[in-house]
Amino acid sequence: LISKEIGQSVNGRSINHLMLGTGKTKVLLWSQMHGDESTATMALFDLFNFFHADDEHNDLRKLILGSLELHIVPMLNPDGAQQWKRRNDLEIDINRDARMLVTPEGRALMSLAKKIQPVIGFNLHDQSTLYAAGRNDNTATLSFLAPAYDYPKSMNEVRKRATQLILTMNEALQTKVPGKIAKYDDAFDPRCFGDTFQGMGISTILIESGGFYADPEKQYIRKLNFYALLNAFVSIAEKTYVNQNLADYEKISENSRSLYDVLIRNVSISKEGIQFRTNLGIVRSQIKGPDFGSMSYNGRIEELGDVELTHGYDEIEASSLTLTPGNIKLMRKSEWEALSPLQELELIRAGYLFVKWTDGTSPSGPLKARLLNLTNKETNTIQTASIGQQAQFLLSRDGKPVYAVLNGYVLDLTKDVTSVPNVFGY
């Protein structure tokens, strides 16, 4: 493994290029050009560990490293990664800078590509977890694209090779996550590195890490990246990708923004003096900690109404349920501190979602390791469902809470669930 600095970020952080393999076919991989997209970065280090191991897979390593020369930039945007943000410290999206090359990070990548002249490139990203593979409940766990290199979306040998490699990876991944692989729209954008590299003769493949149920940290998706890339390397080494039929690319489902974190169907809501049944979609957004080293979540109502052809990671059929506001429990700070998770759960079952201290002002912002929210208000201002409102309410049957929605997380009150990632202080 050879490591070289190919440039520095806006704030002087090293951008490193690692090389391994002695083969004739050069392959370039780069990750985290968007600083808050790190799933593939982890997978690249899994690959480094794999290639430096000594076990029953030595023949596979010999095949790949003897056939390919791998050039890897695991973190193109270290400033963005440090602050967990998409853009660099000039506030420019590096992946929209392939033409102007204003960013030092973009210049470093372009310079490397021109210097080594790879045959194949892998552009590694994360996408929202709310994309589906088609208009169904299959999450788009990984999405692919063989970018166009011109506005007519022409297909030459360079783009054909990228498409065939996608089909090779899709074939392998369908055995692990059937139905959960999608493809991106291929509208040409000359600002993007993938489109530009394709036009430069580098067969470029975009891989986007999306969502998978009960994998919020994308650790399973990390493994799928590793698996997909390893299969691609073998196919490149053995040139088996040439057997793929281009027509099969059209059979891969389109990427579709049609998921919610929580979808509640047919719930009864009272609003503006009217009682009606409708559907309610909730999404959870990330909140960066002050040190950029921790993450909290903010669950809000994104949709009310007809949600045709949309689905949720968690779904509740609420045709017998009514949305009801949570009550506020008054207690001293010391009493709140002494509450066990099961005691908090019992208060929620009794209809409480908030605690107000009677002897002081409680903190605002995300609260971890608690179930009940804190409030400094005399009354609960969340009395019904509104677009953009934080998702803090009960679903009740005949006046008895059946589910609690706490900051966009669903608690089935028939079960002893005693944790959510975070609630809030108001």
Which residue ranges define each predicted feature?
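Short beta-strand/turn micro-motifs at beta-sheet edges
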Residues: 12, 81, 192-196
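Active-site-proximal beta-strand elements of phosphoester/diester hydrolases
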Residues: 16-17, 28-30, 94-95, 206-208
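Active-site beta-strand termini and strand-to-loop segments that position acidic
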Residues: 19-22
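Conserved beta-strand scaffold positions in the cores of enzyme catalytic domains, especially
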Residues: 3, 17, 72, 121, ...
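Short glycine- and acidic-rich boundary segments immediately preceding or forming the N-terminal edge
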Residues: 1-15
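Active-site/substrate-binding loop(s) of hydrolase catalytic cores
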Residues: 24-26, 33, 38-170, 179
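Catalytic-site microenvironment of enzymes
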Residues: 6, 54, 58, 426
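C-terminal accessory segments enriched in acidic
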Residues: 145-154, 162-426
